[in-house]
Regions:
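Compact, glycine/acidic-enriched structural inserts
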Residues: 106-137
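A surface-exposed partner-binding patch
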Residues: 1-109, 138-142
């Protein structure tokens, strides 16, 4: 299957870090497979390509919110958890019954209540919007 999302995720390095994408910005496919085997989870195509493109890029993997390393992925409450905020108030996930969808919808859980709410977008939409918010809106505010 052709890469559907890889180039779009790779393009985030020059857009937000003002540097060319390098292979070390992503995780090698064999390492990703090994870490997913350790976690014991399957992931959607979009998340696989996200890790292949950016899994080694700490500046993006930990840009305000923290993406879980592949070996830390877990299914909880019927969702594959992949992201948390710095205060650990929220966690983001993909419904476990949607992992075969190439680009599934993203949901957010308020940890204090344990309630899930749709983010009204797919993983690729959510991630691209999140990085735009972090680097184009939030970061300039924090610098002032």
């Amino acid at each position: 299957m052709a890469d559907m999302f890889l180039e779009k995720f790779q393009s985030l390095v020059p857009r937000y870090l003002e540097d060319e994408w390098q292979p070390e910005d992503g995780l090698p496919a064999d390492i990703l497979t090994e870490e997913l085997d350790t976690a014991g989870v399957d992931i959607p195509l979009v998340l696989r390509e996200f890790y292949l493109a950016l899994g080694g890029c700490e500046d993006l993997m930990e840009a305000y919110y923290y993406f879980f390393d592949p070996d830390e992925l877990a299914i909880e409450d019927g969702y594959l958890l992949f992201l948390e905020d710095e205060e650990e108030e929220y966690v983001w996930g993909i419904r476990a019954d949607q992992l075969d969808v190439p680009d599934p919808m993203v949901f957010r859980r308020l940890n204090a209540r344990g309630t899930w709410k749709s983010e009204e977008g797919t993983f690729s939409e959510y991630v691209l919007d999140m990085f735009a918010w972090v680097f184009e809106e939030l970061e300039p505010e924090l610098e002032n």
